[in-house]
């Protein structure tokens, strides 16, 4: 798995400090409100520590936590980057249910607690590349989607895995007001091939920076597919359906000439309105500290995922 040098991204010192404290105290999924140790105060339900297996040690240097939680695309809460943190602050994620259905032998439902204790949680530090040509490095906490797929026991007809975001216009103003929500036909829907879903890199995340996901980042559970553009990593999932046929996903329906089904990070295939050859790195600096770097094929995960697309024309199947 590709790693960063210490000069690639602004370090997140606070994350390492907090994780050491949490681990030393032996605290797990129970509620934990940390005292003021140098990071911004947040709602107590966002400070619940998660019990997880650390990512392998290395020179991973992370995007500052306040940028990860304050610079978001989540159109259900508005199209401005700051809107999700502002309008999702009272979003209720407990109780919650995640339904597994479709072409499976073992359909089931997970409640809120089961999202955190059904599968062993682990930390994954991944590059995150938005289709808008900006990037972050984020320490997710979650479990491989493959574990859930194996529990569901898909039938031989299951070729695609379809994900559905919660539809709740009373809580999600972007669903209530189409202008506020970017003109999207909600609920938001995304999908992967069954092979993509089973790849070890594909993660269902329930946390970041050692804590439960905040609402603006897709609480309580979201998809993370690090070799694809960020819009594939659907948030606040309530249903996963196994299907024989490929659906038309949300952005594919809205603008098919701009957003394809596969959405693999590819510096050789530009968006119709901008280049994808490089990306703006979201770091600790302001506008005067903008850093750009070359975009890597499959976002740097080519060795792990290129075989999934053997024989596929990635310029046509973008």
From Swiss-Prot:
GO terms for biological process: protein repair. Its main location: periplasm. It is found in: Periplasm. Mo-molybdopterin binds at residues 72, 75-76, 130, 165, 217, 222, 233-235. It comes from the Bacteria. The keyword Signal applies. Its cofactor is Mo-molybdopterin. It catalyses: L-methionyl-[protein] + a quinone + H2O = L-methionyl-(S)-S-oxide-[protein] + a quinol; L-methionyl-[protein] + a quinone + H2O = L-methionyl-(R)-S-oxide-[protein] + a quinol. Belongs to the MsrP family. Residues 1-40 form the signal peptide. SUPFAM superfamilies: Oxidoreductase molybdopterin-binding domain. Predicted to be exported by the Tat system. The position of the signal peptide cleavage has not been experimentally proven. Its EC number is 1.8.5.-. It comes from Actinobacillus pleuropneumoniae serotype 3 (strain JL03). Heterodimer of a catalytic subunit (MsrP) and a heme-binding subunit (MsrQ). This is Protein-methionine-sulfoxide reductase catalytic subunit MsrP. Part of the MsrPQ system that repairs oxidized periplasmic proteins containing methionine sulfoxide residues (Met-O), using respiratory chain electrons. Thus protects these proteins from oxidative-stress damage caused by reactive species of oxygen and chlorine generated by the host defense mechanisms. MsrPQ is essential for the maintenance of envelope integrity under bleach stress, rescuing a wide series of structurally unrelated periplasmic proteins from methionine oxidation. GO terms for molecular function: metal ion binding; molybdopterin cofactor binding; oxidoreductase activity, acting on a sulfur group of donors, quinone or similar compound as acceptor. InterPro entries: MsrP (IPR022867), OxRdtase_Mopterin-bd_dom (IPR000572), OxRdtase_Mopterin-bd_sf (IPR036374). GO terms for cellular component: periplasmic space. Binds 1 Mo-molybdopterin (Mo-MPT) cofactor per subunit. Keywords: Metal-binding, Molybdenum, Oxidoreductase, Periplasm, Signal.
